[in-house]
Structure formats: structure tokens, C-alpha cells
Amino acid sequence: MWEQLYDPFGNEYVSALVALTPILFFLLALTVLKMKGILAAFLTLAVSFFVSVWAFHMPVEKAISSVLLGIGSGLWPIGYIVLMAVWLYKIAVKTGKFTIIRSSIAGISPDQRLQLLLIGFCFNAFLEGAAGFGVPIAISAALLVELGFKPLKAAALCLIANAASGAFGAIGIPVITGAQIGDLSALELSRTLMWTLPMISFLIPFLLVFLLDRMKGIKQTWPALLVVSGGYTAVQTLTMAVLGPELANILAALFSMGGLALFLRKWQPKEIYREEGAGDAGEKKAYRAADIAKAWSPFYILTAAITIWSLPAFKALFQEGGLLYQSTLLFKMPFLHQQIMKMPPIAPSAMPLDAVFKVDLLSATGTAILAAVIVTGLFSKKFSSRDAFASLKETGKELWVPIMTICFVMGFANLANFAGLSSSIGLALAKTGDLFPFVSPVLGWIGVFITGSVVSNNALFGHLQVVTGAQIGAGSDLLLAANTAGGVMAKLVSPQSIAIAAAAVGQTGKESKLFKRTVAYSLILLLIICIWTFILARLGV
């Protein structure tokens, strides 16, 4: 049994700085050294291994086991999800459905600023609410490329758009997890987030149009922007207040997407915006409603499948004692499972950490996407099973590098968690006293940057936020909300998100360029959250 050591140098700030070394190296590798994502991720993993074993005295066999668990998590479920999502997209392209999809979107508006709002913001948010785990960024970015957007720009815009919806991904799991850690109801934490996230949700559509066409774009499309921002923010806020986090994205996205489509039947900007090299807006051919519905079928089949997979009754089938429980394979990691003790104040008392590699063959989100692939293939008469498998092989060849990048990132994330590196950073930030509400979102940002997940971030730092809040007299619900909101802003730049987005638009190897496009906006949005959280704490919210 090994106990985590959070201050190996006898100075919390020095220990935190050493723990921060792998993150600083990764940032340097992408921005200054301009390494490819896979090399930057591998070297970051090597640096974190050295820091964990040498500085934080983690036994070598436990460090190796934690890395292997992380790499396994990168393959399943994350790599599986990305592979299935891109495969579905490729089938939609190869069956000719995108010609009709492009025309149907152009029929709503040929203006790329408005197409960005429909697909990059609304549809992105809808998929985030239904699936999460990289699916919305992969699908919506690929759709934008088909509509004539430049690949890296499409990926960056979808990453930035995700700031409005990332807290409520996969039926609200991040908020539900944070609430459990803080001994709150999901509705309580959701209502606290009402004070923070709707402000960001309202700003994001304006930011997206500004990035595409500067102030000219905002001036020319402000009525549509008000429909999207106002509708999305109002419904998201109302849902958070009345129903909780589960449907906050889905209802808001459906309302704003439907509202914008109806509004654009009566209003269009005087000047149509198309990016240079984007070509025309798509075929002007009038398709039958049945043809349009069939073209969009891969995505509403995907939505239906993910919705079914998210139902409590369906999930119950895979729980212990459930009919399909045996379909989930569990592997306890040697030298790691319950062999490391998380210590106070990170945990209420010394507690062993579980380390189980879970292969949920049927209940995984990737399997829901696979079901959508199968149904789509069955209804595509001119697309044989041989064509489908050839497309899968092509997808695998394209994605093996980004999936390995994700594996290395997850290896680092797991190592940072099990070695106590993340906790060391968190404890140093918690020493800021009355200023902690200002830095509380920064802790969430670091958590998501490391793990790539708002859920994992809340599980990692949620208790620390609660403990620190009790020490300084700040509400635990506000700090948990800050941890969640700050974490969402890191989804714009987390290595996992960057790798998925780059792969989805065929730009693997250009992760550093994509990172540079999003990092400034991630930090600006984080600063807004920090200032606002500090103000709310001073007001006693």
C-alpha cells in the first residue's frame, strides 16, 4: 500500500510547481517547439513518469500500471467512440447524403455565419447533451467542412462553441458527478450554475460570428444572433432552474435550432457571407421532404440510439444483477487497484483508489453509434457491407495516430491522478485564502486540461473545493459550480479535445496550429468566470 505524497519538497508551492512541469512542457511543446500532437503527448507522458517516480516517490510498478490503465481508457471507450463517430460520418458522405444535407442547410440560409450558428453551435450543443465524449465536436466540425469551411477553422469554431454546452454533456453527467462529490442534489448545483454559465452561453454565438466575419458579421446578423443566444440561454436557464442538468443542452439546442430555422424563413441578411474558396452554397436543386429526411437519417438515428442508451431503464440492464450485466468486462489493474491511498485533505479520510479497466461492450456510447451505423447501412441500398468495412478500414488508418495521441494523454492524466500531481497543484491553489473563489475556476480548468473530462475534473477536485470553501466561509455549491464552469473552458484546449477535433477534419499532425487558434479564447472565458465567481462570493451567493 502506497500513500500519496502531496508535498515531497516540504514547500507546497515548490511541490506544486514540480507537479505542474508536465503541463508546462506540453504547452511549450505545442506552442514554441511546434511538435506534432502525438510526439508532444508521448514526451509529456515521459516527463510525468519521471516526476511521479523521482519527485513524488511513486513506486515504479504502480506508475506503469496507472499509465497502462490510462492508455486502455484512451482505446476504450474514447478511441472507440471517435472511430465509430467518424465512420458514421464517412458512410453519410459515401452514400451521397451530404449533397442533400448541404442543399437543405443552404435552403435555410446560404450564409455561412448562419450555418455556423445552426451546425457549429445548436447542433453541436444538441449532440453534447445527448452524447458528449468528443462526438459533438467530431460530427459538427466535419459537417462544417462539407459546407465549405476551412478544416482548422471549423475545428476551432466547434471547440469554442462547446464552451456553452460542455457542463451538461451526456445527459448532465458532469453536474451530477459534482453534486455527488459535494453532497448536494443535482438540482441544487444546477441552480447555482445558473449564476455563471448562461452568461457564457449568451456570449458564445456572438463570439463565433465575430471570429468568422468580425464586427461586420455581428452588425449584419444581430437579429439571428439574438434569436439563437436569447432562445438558447433562456431555455437553458429555465431548464437548469426547474428540471436540473439532464436536459439543459438538449431542450435549449432544439429550441434555438428550431427558432432560428423558422426565423430565417422570414429574414435573411442583406449581404450573404461566404468564405473565400468556399464555393457556392450548395446545389439549388429542390429535394423532396422525404429525400431530405433520409439524408439526415444517420444523425437522427444516432440521436435516437444515444437517447435509448441514456435511459435509466436501459442503463439498469447493465448494472449488477441486471439482465446484461455479464456483457461488461472488468479488469482490476495489478499493483494499482486499491493499492494507493488518497489522503486528507484531498479525501475526507485515507481511502484506497479503485483502478478497474471497464470494457462495456454493449452499454458504451460507441456501441450506440455502431447501432446507428448498422441501421444507416441497412437503409442505404447502394452501399454494401463490403463498402462499409472498406470505409471502416480507411477510417482506422486515418485515426490511429490521433487515437494513440489520446492514449498517451490519458496515460499522463491517470498518472497525474494516481501519483498525486493534480492534488499537489490543487492544494497550492487552495492556500490563496479569501482569493480562492477567484482561482477556484482555474483549478477546474487545470483538471479538465489534464483529464480531458469535466466529469473526471469534478471527481478529482470536487472534494478539495468543498473543503476549501468550508475553511474560508464560501458556499460549497458556488465553488463546485466554479470548478465545473472553469473546467468547461479548458475543453477548448485539452489535448484530448484538440486531437479529436484535428482528426475529425483530417488535420492530424496540426494540433499545435489548432491549439493556438483556441487557447486565447479559453483563457479569456476562464478569466470572465474567475472574476464573476469572485464577485458572487463577495455577494454571498
UniProtKB/Swiss-Prot annotation:
Residues spanning the membrane: 13-33, 38-58, 67-87, 125-145, 156-176, 192-212, 222-242, 243-263, 298-318, 359-379, 399-419, 435-455, 519-539
Chief location category: membrane
InterPro entries, alphabetized: Lactate_perm
Membrane topology: Multi-pass membrane protein
Induction pattern: Strongly induced under anaerobic conditions. Activated by ResDE, Fnr and ArfM.
GO cellular component: a single term: plasma membrane
Pfam families: Lactate_perm
Subcellular location: Cell membrane
Molecular function via GO: lactate transmembrane transporter activity; solute:proton symporter activity
Keywords assigned by UniProt, alphabetized: Cell membrane, Membrane, Transmembrane, Transmembrane helix, Transport
PANTHER family: L-LACTATE PERMEASE
Known role: May play a role in L-lactate transport.
Similarity field: Belongs to the lactate permease family.
Protein name listed in UniProt: L-lactate permease
Organism expressing this protein natively: Bacillus subtilis (strain 168)
GN (gene name): lctP
